[in-house]
């Protein structure tokens, strides 16, 4: 890991702050989520939502999307320059669900972007509060990570669909800043780079001229972000090669895919944070909680505690299982989509089932779905224990994994061995160790072969009772290692389509 001196904690990235001490970080993160809460309350007032309607997660998502769209400078500029039929570039909106005569009805609302921006700034002491916007993007990204699999996207870039544990944050917009970069998985970064290189191969002007210079800077920056996620010297050296390449082409794509595969065993450091829907912060603010004064952390007990006493509802389709819908949202809140299911189950206190066994579709309701048959139910978002979210890959060791997902990317800092199937992973490394990166490749393969299943990651780290806010008594769970470990095992989840 890089010396702590140069690293900002993710709360600092998220709040755009320079180095702060723990109290200042807690206060600025508190200010950020408090601003989201105040904005949400104001929007509910504007839209005349009842208390129940304001607690509906689908309404929360619509309101979040409106503010993200209102502040999307690039897209707004594009929409103004390329007017398309039926799209007013100055307006934003979406479906709002209301309870009428015992039924749920959908109402499509439209708002001036300028007005939404005004309400957002007003809730955030007159500032743009980009940190809060990024926070909402990460919540949407975590929701996508829990809901969809990215098989098609992986295959398109030449990667193996079983590498889905590396794909955290793959739906985050480009403008999500440092906090967004911190939560992106190795596979996500590799995919972005491969797409860029492919464009360069197909379009000879891509790296040329004034625009090309900017492209090159973006390329090198992305390489550096990815390099920073790797924890071994050989992986980092390979990233230097990719970054310094004169004109990136197929050799670089090969190197990147090699690195992505290696990350299944030599895991990268990927940040995890609990980002909750805006309505949860709104509920807390409405009940008089002062986030800035009390302080808040995205990686400690605070989100767990907030969810313990928030009642959030969701629309449920006729044949969906409300308990499964709750699991989906719980996973989206704490971002363990690629975590070992046994760890998630232990913390949640109820069994977390693999994606393929869930009787539920995504949280968002399509505009053509019939509202007549929609019901709503309370989401069970409480947990039995809490654990600190990690930003390391928890590297030391490995062990058996499953067919649908051949590795995990730990979310919680809890002692265990990390499951993965060495035979499957190593099979991908036959042959090709020649070329400029041969010595590094050989070194990486050697490290992977020497990784021992019996070693334990996060030694001595445990989960904590919800009454133990200072994390003084770690409970180190023992896991039944014969059990299935991965969420996307044997999966038939829907694909994510933009």
From Swiss-Prot:
Record note on quaternary structure: Homomultimerizes to form the nucleocapsid. May bind host exportin-1/XPO1. Binds to viral genomic RNA. Protein-RNA contacts are mediated by a combination of electrostatic interactions between positively charged residues and the phosphate backbone and planar interactions between aromatic side chains and bases.
Motif extent (Bipartite nuclear localization signal): 198-216
Protein name: Nucleoprotein
Function according to Swiss-Prot or TrEMBL: Encapsidates the negative strand viral RNA, protecting it from nucleases. The encapsidated genomic RNA is termed the ribonucleoprotein (RNP) and serves as template for transcription and replication. The RNP needs to be localized in the host nucleus to start an infectious cycle, but is too large to diffuse through the nuclear pore complex. NP comprises at least 2 nuclear localization signals that are responsible for the active RNP import into the nucleus through cellular importin alpha/beta pathway.
Single GO term (MF): structural molecule activity
Location of this chain's protein in the cell: Virion; Host nucleus
Record keywords: Capsid protein, Helical capsid protein, Host nucleus, Host-virus interaction, Ribonucleoprotein, RNA-binding, Viral nucleoprotein, Viral penetration into host nucleus, Virion, Virus entry into host cell
InterPro entries with a match to the protein in the record: Flu_NP
Family membership noted in the UniProt record: Belongs to the influenza viruses nucleoprotein family.
Motif Unconventional nuclear localization signal location, chain numbering: 1-18
Pfam families: Flu_NP
A GO CC term assigned to this protein in UniProt: helical viral capsid
Region annotation (Disordered) ranges: 1-21
Description of post-translational modifications: Late in virus-infected cells, may be cleaved from a 56-kDa protein to a 53-kDa protein by a cellular caspase. This cleavage might be a marker for the onset of apoptosis in infected cells or have a specific function in virus host interaction.
One GO BP: symbiont entry into host cell
The keyword Ribonucleoprotein belongs to this UniProt entry's keyword annotation: yes
Source organism, top-level taxon: Viruses
Gene coding for it: NP
Keyword Acyltransferase tagged: no
